[in-house]
Swiss-Prot record:
Decoration protein that binds asymmetrically to the center of each capsid protein hexamer after capsid expansion. Stabilizes the capsid and protects from DNA release. Gene3D superfamilies: Immunoglobulins. This is Decoration protein. InterPro entries: DECO_N, Ig-like_dom, Ig-like_dom_sf, Ig-like_fold. It comes from the Viruses. Residues 1-72 are annotated as: Binding to the capsid hexamer. PROSITE patterns: IG_LIKE. Interacts with the major capsid protein; each hexon binds a single copy of the decoration protein. Pfam families: Ig_3, Phage_pb10_N. Transmembrane segments: none annotated. It comes from Escherichia phage T5 (Enterobacteria phage T5). It is found in: Virion. Keywords: Capsid decoration protein, Capsid protein, Late protein, Virion.
Length: 164
Protein backbone atom coordinates (compact mmCIF):
# COMPACT_ATOMS: atom_id res chain seq x y z
CA UNK A 1 0.00 0.00 0.00
CA UNK A 2 1.28 3.47 -0.86
CA UNK A 3 1.83 5.66 2.19
CA UNK A 4 0.64 8.96 0.76
CA UNK A 5 0.83 10.68 4.15
CA UNK A 6 4.46 9.67 4.54
CA UNK A 7 5.24 10.85 1.04
CA UNK A 8 3.46 14.15 1.70
CA UNK A 9 5.73 14.77 4.71
CA UNK A 10 8.76 14.37 2.43
CA UNK A 11 7.60 16.14 -0.74
CA UNK A 12 4.73 18.42 0.25
CA UNK A 13 1.97 18.99 -2.27
CA UNK A 14 4.05 18.70 -5.45
CA UNK A 15 6.12 15.70 -6.43
CA UNK A 16 9.57 16.21 -7.97
CA UNK A 17 10.59 14.58 -11.24
CA UNK A 18 10.43 10.79 -11.14
CA UNK A 19 14.19 10.13 -10.96
CA UNK A 20 14.52 12.48 -7.96
CA UNK A 21 11.45 10.90 -6.37
CA UNK A 22 12.78 7.33 -6.61
CA UNK A 23 16.23 8.32 -5.35
CA UNK A 24 14.68 10.05 -2.33
CA UNK A 25 12.13 7.39 -1.38
CA UNK A 26 14.60 4.53 -1.67
CA UNK A 27 15.94 5.46 1.76
CA UNK A 28 12.42 5.71 3.21
CA UNK A 29 11.05 2.52 1.60
CA UNK A 30 7.68 4.13 0.74
CA UNK A 31 7.60 3.20 -2.97
CA UNK A 32 10.47 1.00 -4.13
CA UNK A 33 9.90 0.73 -7.90
CA UNK A 34 7.73 1.24 -10.98
CA UNK A 35 6.67 -2.43 -10.66
CA UNK A 36 5.34 -1.68 -7.16
CA UNK A 37 3.45 1.35 -8.50
CA UNK A 38 1.98 -0.72 -11.34
CA UNK A 39 0.62 -3.26 -8.83
CA UNK A 40 -0.73 -0.59 -6.46
CA UNK A 41 -2.40 1.37 -9.26
CA UNK A 42 -3.77 -1.72 -11.03
CA UNK A 43 -1.73 -1.18 -14.19
CA UNK A 44 -0.19 -3.88 -16.34
CA UNK A 45 3.41 -4.22 -17.43
CA UNK A 46 2.27 -2.94 -20.84
CA UNK A 47 2.01 0.55 -19.34
CA UNK A 48 5.15 2.61 -19.86
CA UNK A 49 7.01 4.10 -16.92
CA UNK A 50 5.88 7.54 -18.12
CA UNK A 51 2.21 6.44 -18.00
CA UNK A 52 2.69 4.82 -14.57
CA UNK A 53 4.31 8.01 -13.26
CA UNK A 54 1.46 10.15 -14.65
CA UNK A 55 -1.15 7.95 -12.92
CA UNK A 56 0.82 8.04 -9.67
CA UNK A 57 1.05 11.85 -9.74
CA UNK A 58 -2.75 12.00 -10.24
CA UNK A 59 -3.33 9.56 -7.36
CA UNK A 60 -0.91 11.51 -5.15
CA UNK A 61 -2.78 14.75 -5.81
CA UNK A 62 -6.12 13.16 -4.89
CA UNK A 63 -4.90 11.18 -1.86
CA UNK A 64 -4.51 14.11 0.50
CA UNK A 65 -6.24 17.40 -0.21
CA UNK A 66 -3.92 20.39 -0.41
CA UNK A 67 -3.45 22.50 2.66
CA UNK A 68 -5.72 25.51 2.77
CA UNK A 69 -4.05 28.75 1.74
CA UNK A 70 -2.70 30.95 4.48
CA UNK A 71 -4.98 33.80 5.52
CA UNK A 72 -4.00 37.12 3.92
CA UNK A 73 -1.29 39.24 5.48
CA UNK A 74 -2.87 41.83 7.77
CA UNK A 75 -1.87 44.12 10.59
CA UNK A 76 -3.90 43.04 13.60
CA UNK A 77 -2.29 45.96 15.44
CA UNK A 78 -1.68 48.99 13.22
CA UNK A 79 -0.16 52.40 13.86
CA UNK A 80 -2.47 55.15 15.07
CA UNK A 81 -3.01 58.09 12.72
CA UNK A 82 -1.22 60.43 15.14
CA UNK A 83 0.59 60.49 18.45
CA UNK A 84 2.42 62.96 20.66
CA UNK A 85 5.48 62.34 22.77
CA UNK A 86 7.31 64.64 25.16
CA UNK A 87 10.82 65.68 24.21
CA UNK A 88 13.27 63.39 26.02
CA UNK A 89 10.72 60.57 26.42
CA UNK A 90 10.83 57.32 24.46
CA UNK A 91 9.14 57.27 21.05
CA UNK A 92 7.76 53.77 20.42
CA UNK A 93 5.79 52.66 17.38
CA UNK A 94 4.62 49.07 16.99
CA UNK A 95 2.60 46.83 14.67
CA UNK A 96 1.55 43.19 14.84
CA UNK A 97 1.46 41.22 11.58
CA UNK A 98 -0.74 38.14 11.19
CA UNK A 99 -1.58 35.85 8.31
CA UNK A 100 0.46 35.52 5.19
CA UNK A 101 3.49 33.27 5.37
CA UNK A 102 6.12 34.05 7.99
CA UNK A 103 8.72 35.05 8.73
CA UNK A 104 8.04 38.73 8.20
CA UNK A 105 10.41 41.59 7.44
CA UNK A 106 9.77 45.18 8.50
CA UNK A 107 10.91 48.34 6.69
CA UNK A 108 10.29 51.54 8.66
CA UNK A 109 10.29 54.99 7.08
CA UNK A 110 10.13 58.55 8.41
CA UNK A 111 8.86 61.18 5.98
CA UNK A 112 9.31 58.62 3.16
CA UNK A 113 12.98 57.86 3.89
CA UNK A 114 14.17 54.51 5.29
CA UNK A 115 15.14 54.49 8.96
CA UNK A 116 18.53 52.72 9.28
CA UNK A 117 18.51 49.62 11.51
CA UNK A 118 14.72 49.76 12.02
CA UNK A 119 13.82 46.20 11.01
CA UNK A 120 11.51 44.81 13.68
CA UNK A 121 7.83 44.97 14.52
CA UNK A 122 8.60 47.75 17.01
CA UNK A 123 10.57 50.92 16.37
CA UNK A 124 11.87 52.73 19.45
CA UNK A 125 13.78 55.97 19.73
CA UNK A 126 14.88 56.01 23.41
CA UNK A 127 15.01 59.80 23.68
CA UNK A 128 12.73 61.77 21.36
CA UNK A 129 13.98 65.12 20.06
CA UNK A 130 12.25 67.83 18.00
CA UNK A 131 13.75 66.44 14.77
CA UNK A 132 11.98 63.11 15.40
CA UNK A 133 8.62 64.70 14.60
CA UNK A 134 7.27 63.52 11.24
CA UNK A 135 5.27 60.89 9.39
CA UNK A 136 6.17 57.28 10.21
CA UNK A 137 5.13 54.16 8.35
CA UNK A 138 6.20 50.52 8.19
CA UNK A 139 5.90 48.05 5.33
CA UNK A 140 5.59 44.42 6.43
CA UNK A 141 6.59 41.76 3.88
CA UNK A 142 6.06 38.03 4.30
CA UNK A 143 8.24 35.21 2.96
CA UNK A 144 6.20 35.06 -0.26
CA UNK A 145 6.92 38.74 -0.93
CA UNK A 146 3.37 39.89 -0.10
CA UNK A 147 3.49 43.34 1.49
CA UNK A 148 1.18 45.34 3.73
CA UNK A 149 1.66 49.02 4.57
CA UNK A 150 0.72 50.38 7.96
CA UNK A 151 -1.30 53.49 8.54
CA UNK A 152 0.92 56.58 8.42
CA UNK A 153 1.39 57.96 11.92
CA UNK A 154 1.98 61.70 12.33
CA UNK A 155 4.29 62.05 15.33
CA UNK A 156 4.50 65.32 17.23
CA UNK A 157 7.30 65.92 19.72
CA UNK A 158 6.21 68.38 22.41
CA UNK A 159 9.04 70.53 23.80
CA UNK A 160 9.74 70.26 27.49
CA UNK A 161 8.85 73.27 29.54
CA UNK A 162 11.95 74.70 31.28
CA UNK A 163 11.67 74.32 35.03
CA UNK A 164 8.40 72.39 34.58
Amino acid sequence: MIDYSGLRTIFGEKLPESHIFFATVAAHKYVPSYAFLRRELGLSSAHTNRKVWKKFVEAYGKAIPPAPPAPPLTLSKDLTASMSVEEGAALTLSVTATGGTGPYTYAWTKDGSPIPDASGATYTKPTAAAEDAGSYKVTVTDSKQVSKDSTTCAVTVNPTVPGG
